[in-house]
């Protein structure tokens, strides 16, 4: 009570003194000063939150493979991956670094396009794809579409750590086979990434005049301007110096009189030199950090140099290509639309083999995706390309994908197309071969479908097939001039069954490919039509931990069996062209077995592949492409090592 009274008296005294005063009451102000609270410390070194970019993926594309699967496999080049697909028939020339061909689900080499993050690696003159140009050790994912043609989209691996990353790949086998590749990558911040890869490769010396020497450089970078804008750039250079045998002299394919000393090449002193450079730079946008990119603008510069002097003639060109492309994606609930426009210009700096010195084209396309149900997707596509020489190409197609209770999946796709002749087929000029400016567009319809049944969590069976009806396809005629075909039909089908659990991977498949000329043109009567090909494949692998779980090992075999002879495609080196109409002796029936082992210990993998292990057992050797013998037995040993910090 006394304390309270004293306080009251003091307050009264102060108030009485302040009645006539205009001074600020400092005691009152101090009495309401808020208490000091602890302030949070600002960590200037805290990493910036950047959500990884998601690139746009075209509608209707299926997943083929990814980095997690590829790391256990050993492929000298990306063509080798296709050679062992269950739905493919391969036509290889015997050494890596060459223009190999693959018939994938009935789609021939001239119906295929490959896109590496915006770079179209098709040859602008011939339309062919060189699988050696694809940096397959850098692949993150692969998706494909089978409709009017075959389209493959390849996305490269991404790295999401700030520490530097490097890897070393080395493969070696007998004769002159060797692969050496190393990469260095660094995220300098959460926004900026740079990487550089060099790949040296060589093969050959198992037969005369088949040595291959090449290398590849990939420089790549991307930078986030902010959370929703990214700039990406890729430089890709491929260089090869190849001895060119122009095929080998074959009397009896069954006798297979080939080795490194006893083989007669059709050309004894021809060497080709190839250099291709691609550089693409683009800016891309997304609505927010959790969205897929919805808009982009790309500019691409490409330089193609090729030189091949031989006895009768010389192939030589230096072609420059400039292109620009823009796309925009619209998403409204279950409806998505992509619009795309592009323009390209092509001009020769040097040219000895084409009547055309330059050309250009513009393209427009749209894709539509509708998801009316959770297990149903319907897609549609329209594309148009207009070339400066007056030719126009179109394609209208679509399809649907249905999944039922994760047990049954059904997909079908189809297209009506009008495909332009290639620049080579129209304007080629050499001593022995000529283009034809009177060629018409190939027109037709293509239908593709596939069905897969998951019998349980381990067993899967399925089938797929393609039917094509067309006319005016371009072929090399009997007078060495390109001509249009009559009505043609082709059918291809595959059936397979697979078993997979934590210990075993087993798969068996059979592929049939048939081609028929319904109404042959007189000028094309010598062509080798009406061919049927059957390939049967079996794969069996066992996998698991070993050495007290210190290593994970995968071991198995792959077999290929072709039970009937058939007329093969033939690579015309003088044209740099895959003829569908080889007049050589049919390829005999053959079989092949490859044994593989891969083992991972921490960040190091050891891979081994015993190619053509049964060579000499039941057959002396075999061919996949007419006049080009496949290599004998060899053991490839490789090391994959990744380093951080």
Predicted regions and their residues:
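Exposed, low-structure sequence patches enriched in small/polar residues
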Residues: 126-128, 168, 279, 284, ...
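Boundary at the C-terminal end of the N-terminal hydrophobic targeting segment
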Residues: 8-12
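Coil residues (strongly favoring Ser/Thr
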Residues: 15-16, 20-21, 25-26, 30-31, ...
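Flexible loop and strand-edge segments within Gram-negative outer membrane beta-barrel domains
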Residues: 208, 230-290, 302-321, 415
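Outer-membrane beta-barrel proteins
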Residues: 171-173, 177, 199-224, 268-274, ...
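Acidic, small-polar-rich N-terminal luminal/periplasmic segments of exported/outer-membrane proteins
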Residues: 25-164, 169
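Outer-membrane beta-barrel translocator/receptor signature
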Residues: 148-153, 159-217, 228-229
């Amino acid at each position: 009570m006394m304390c309270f009274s004293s306080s009251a008296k003091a307050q009264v005294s102060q108030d009485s003194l302040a009645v006539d005063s205009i001074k600020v009451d400092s005691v009152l102000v101090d009495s309401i000063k808020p208490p000091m609270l602890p302030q949070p410390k600002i960590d200037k070194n805290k990493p910036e939150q950047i959500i990884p970019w998601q690139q746009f993926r075209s509608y209707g594309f299926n997943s083929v493979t990814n980095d997690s699967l590829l790391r256990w496999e050993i492929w000298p080049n990306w063509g080798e991956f296709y050679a062992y697909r269950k739905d493919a028939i391969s036509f290889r020339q015997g050494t890596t670094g060459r223009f190999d061909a693959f018939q994938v689900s009935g789609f021939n080499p001239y119906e295929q396009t490959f896109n590496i993050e915006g770079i179209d690696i098709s040859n602008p003159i011939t339309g062919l794809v060189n699988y050696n140009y694809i940096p397959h050790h850098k692949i993150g994912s692969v998706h494909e579409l089978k409709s009017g043609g075959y389209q493959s989209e390849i996305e490269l691996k991404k790295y999401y750590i700030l520490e530097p990353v490097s890897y070393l790949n080395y493969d070696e086998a007998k004769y002159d086979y060797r692969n050496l590749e190393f990469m260095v990558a660094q995220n300098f911040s959460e926004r900026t990434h740079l990487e550089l890869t060099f790949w040296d490769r060589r093969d050959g010396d198992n037969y005369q005049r088949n040595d291959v020497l090449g290398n590849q450089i990939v420089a790549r970078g991307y930078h986030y301007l902010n959370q929703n804008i990214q700039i990406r750039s890729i430089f890709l250079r491929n260089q090869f110096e190849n001895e060119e045998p122009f095929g080998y002299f074959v009397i009896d394919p069954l006798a297979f009189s080939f080795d490194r000393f006893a083989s007669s090449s059709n050309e004894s002193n021809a060497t080709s030199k190839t250099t291709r450079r691609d550089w693409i730079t683009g800016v891309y946008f997304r609505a927010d950090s959790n969205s897929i990119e919805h808009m982009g603008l790309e500019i691409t510069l490409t330089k193609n140099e090729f030189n091949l002097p031989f006895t009768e003639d010389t192939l030589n060109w230096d072609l420059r290509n400039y292109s620009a492309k823009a796309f925009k994606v619209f998403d409204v609930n279950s409806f998505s639309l992509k619009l795309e426009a592009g323009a390209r210009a092509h001009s020769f700096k040097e040219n000895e083999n084409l009547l055309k010195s330059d050309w250009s084209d513009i393209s427009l396309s749209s894709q539509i995706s509708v998801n009316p149900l959770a297990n149903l997707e319907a897609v549609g596509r329209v594309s148009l390309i207009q070339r400066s020489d007056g030719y126009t190409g179109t394609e209208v197609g679509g399809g649907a994908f249905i999944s039922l209770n994760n047990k049954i999946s059904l997909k079908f796709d189809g297209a009506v197309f009008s495909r332009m002749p290639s620049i080579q087929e129209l304007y080629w000029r050499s001593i022995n071969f000529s283009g034809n400016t009177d060629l018409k567009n190939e027109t037709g319809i293509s239908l593709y479908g596939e069905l897969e049944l998951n019998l349980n969590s381990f067993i899967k069976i399925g089938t797929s097939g393609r039917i094509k009806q067309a006319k005016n396809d371009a072929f090399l005629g009997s007078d060495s001039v390109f001509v249009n075909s009559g009505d043609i039909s082709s059918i291809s089908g595959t059936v397979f069954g697979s078993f997979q659990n934590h210990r075993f991977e087993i798969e068996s498949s059979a592929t049939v490919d048939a081609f028929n000329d319904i109404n042959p043109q007189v000028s094309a009567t010598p062509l080798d039509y009406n061919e049927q090909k059957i390939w049967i494949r079996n794969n069996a692998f066992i996998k698991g931990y070993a050495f007290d779980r210190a290593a994970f090992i995968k071991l198995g075999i792959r077999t290929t069996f072709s039970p009937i002879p058939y007329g093969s495609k033939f690579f015309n080196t003088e044209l740099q062209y895959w003829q569908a109409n080889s007049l050589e002796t049919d390829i005999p029936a053959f079989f092949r077995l490859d044994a593989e082992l891969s083992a991972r210990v921490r960040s190091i993998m050891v891979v081994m592949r015993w190619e053509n292990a049964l060579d000499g057992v039941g057959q002396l050797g075999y061919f996949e492409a007419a006049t080009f013998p496949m290599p004998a037995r060899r053991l490839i040993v490789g090391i994959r090592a990744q380093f951080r910090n």
